[in-house]
Amino acid sequence: IFFALEAAVMAYALELALDIPPTWGYLICAIVVIPLVTHGVSAISRLQVWTQPLWLLMLVVPFVYVLVRDPGAFSGVVHYGGELARGATFQLPLFGAALTVGIALITQMGEQADYLRFMPARTATTRGRWWLGVLVGGPGWVVLGVLKMLGGALLAWLALTHMVPAERAVDPNQMYLVAYEYVFPHYGWAVAATALFVVVSQMKINVTNAYAGSLAWSNFFSRLTHSHPGRVVWVVFNTLIAFMLMEMN
């Protein structure tokens, strides 16, 4: 499911930048990860390392430009009363709805185990650093998660104020397109930057999703059938399921 969600976001980026219909975009975004994942963790690790500087730069720069060019945006999102324009007063039902989403996302911290499994063995000399790495990369990841949620709220508010319909304002492509319009005066450059950032982000996410999914399917079926046809089979199997979910909308 996570693979399908993230691949769909990347497909919408291809539609935005290259006018590729989502039906074909789903197929492209599903199969493009297969060569990387079948080469194993070493290829995935290299991809993550090589793309990290670009990803961090493209993540932060739009927020800096928004802060410089529209300082009132941060105040505006705090005082935004929602679609019903109830003002900035506390509303228990709205708080409950937001809390439900937040609590559900906390369970995704378990996905960090996919990265922590590659931690080097704990030794007497690395005990302190080992525990620090586990805490920061595991449950401590919720801190970055909160920052990302707050940043997403700001971008969604910016999208709404730029007349993006509410049902489309949840699309990261629309969020970052509005933000990158603060960076680039030319709309075409903003579209290109948005598409590049979203594609890099979703590739970084989905190589992990595909790898973790293949491990899960492999473990499940090896215990059920007592056979192991190879992890590549389960990479393709996992990808086909995600593709089917996307095509079924």
Predicted regions and their residues:
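Select transmembrane alpha-helical segments in multipass membrane proteins
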Residues: 1, 86-99, 183-201, 237-240
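Loop-to-transmembrane helix boundary motifs in multi-pass membrane proteins
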Residues: 203, 219-249
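Hydrophobic alpha-helical segments and their helix-loop junctions in multi-pass secondary transporters
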Residues: 12, 16, 20, 56-83, ...
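Selective recognition of specific alpha-helical transmembrane segments in multi-pass small-molecule
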Residues: 2-6, 54-66, 101-108, 131-160, ...
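Membrane-interface loop-to-helix entry segments
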Residues: 24-29, 33-69
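Hydrophobic, small-residue-rich membrane helices and short re-entrant helix-turn-helix hairpins
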Residues: 39-49, 110-146, 162-178, 214-229
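Hydrophobic transmembrane alpha-helices that form the core helical bundles
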Residues: 1-19, 202-219
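TM-loop-TM module centered on a large, flexible mid-protein loop between adjacent transmembrane helices
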Residues: 147, 151-206, 223, 246-247
